[in-house]
Amino acid sequence: MNKTENTLHKKTPSVTVLNNRGLAVRDIVYHRHPDTPDKTDERITRHQFDARGFLQQSADPRMQASGLINFHYVTSLSGQVLRTESADAGTSLTLNDAAGRPVISISQIRTDHGKDDRSVAVTHTFQYERSGSGRPLSIAEQIAGQSAVVSERFVYAGNSEAEKTKNLAGVCTHHYDPAGLMQTDSIALTGVPLSVTRQLLKEADNPDIAVNWPESNPQTLLSAEKFTTQTIADATGAVLNTTDAAGHQQKVTYDIAGLLSSSRVTVKGGAEKIIIKSVDYSAAGQKLREEHGNGVVTTYTYEPQTQRLIAVKTEHPARKKIFQDLRYEYDPVGNVLCVTNDAEETRFWHNQKVVPENRYTYDTLYQLVSATGREMANAGQ
C-alpha cells in the first residue's frame, strides 16, 4: 500500500455502538473517495429494538439522514417476523401456526400513499398433514382480484417393500410445481437421488399459463413425454456417473481426499471424450495444476502467507502456446488491485503505451470506484 492509500484510509475505523443490553444500535463507518481524500463522510446505520430485544426497525445511512427507515418489523411473542415494511419491496405479512410453520403469507402490498394497497398483492396459503409428521401437502397462490390456484402439490411415498427397496419410504416422490412434475424414482442411502424424472405441462409453451393442480388425477395436466436423469454414486454420496435425459453420459473420478481428479463425457452414440485428464492439489486443497483432454494445461500459484491466488497460467505445452499468464496484486484486505496478463504484448497506439493490465481503485469502504484496462477496438467485430 503506497503513501496515498495510507493517507486515504487514515482515521476511518468501523465503529459499532452497543446499548446497555449488548444490542448493536449503531454501525458507523467513514467514507473517503480517492478523488477527494480531504473530505470524510460519516455514514451511520441505525437499528432499533423493542423491549424484548427483537429488531424493530433499521435505517441505512441514506435513509436515516432523511429521518426515514428501510425496514420496520412486527414480531410475534416468540420473535418470528409477522409484518415487514420495506422501503423498496413494500409490505409483506406472514402468519405461522403453533409449530412455527408458515400458514399464510401476503406479499407485494404497496404503501406508496401511506396506507396498505393490496390491489396487486399475492397471497400464498400452505396446507400440511393434520397427523403424523406434519409434512407440507400443497401451496395455493392467489393474486388480488383473481381466484386462488394450487401452484404446488407434494405426494409422499408409503412404507411398502417396493418403496423401501428404493429408499423412498416417507420421501416426497412427486412434486407438482408450476413447470410440471418432478418425480423421484429412487435414492441412495446417502440421500442422493439416483433416478429423477421430469414431466412438463401440456401447455408448457404458453408463458401465461397458471397451473391449478387438482387433488385427484393431477397427471391429466402433464404431457406424455418424460425426461429421466440417472445417477450412480459411491458410498460417500459422491456422484460418479450421470446420464441425462438425452442419453449423454458424464463420468467423474476423485482422489483419496474426495476432490475431483478427472472427468469424461460420452455423447449418445459417440465415443468417450476426456474433459479433464488430471488435477493436482495442494495440502490445503487448492488446485495447483489442471490438464484438459485437449492438451491445455492450467497452473495456479498462491501466496504462501495469505493463500491468495497470485498467478494463473494457461498453455498448450505441445504447441508451445501460452493463452494467458495472469498475475494478481492485492491490498491488505484482499481486494484485487492489479491483474497483468504476461501472455499479451505491450502495444502502442496513437502515441500511447498500452500495457496488458487492469487496475482497480477502491474507497475507504472497499467499494470499487474505478477500473482501467486495455480494450480491443475490434473485439466486437
Please annotate each region the language model reported.
Residues 1-381:
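Beta-strand elements of repeat-based all-beta scaffolds
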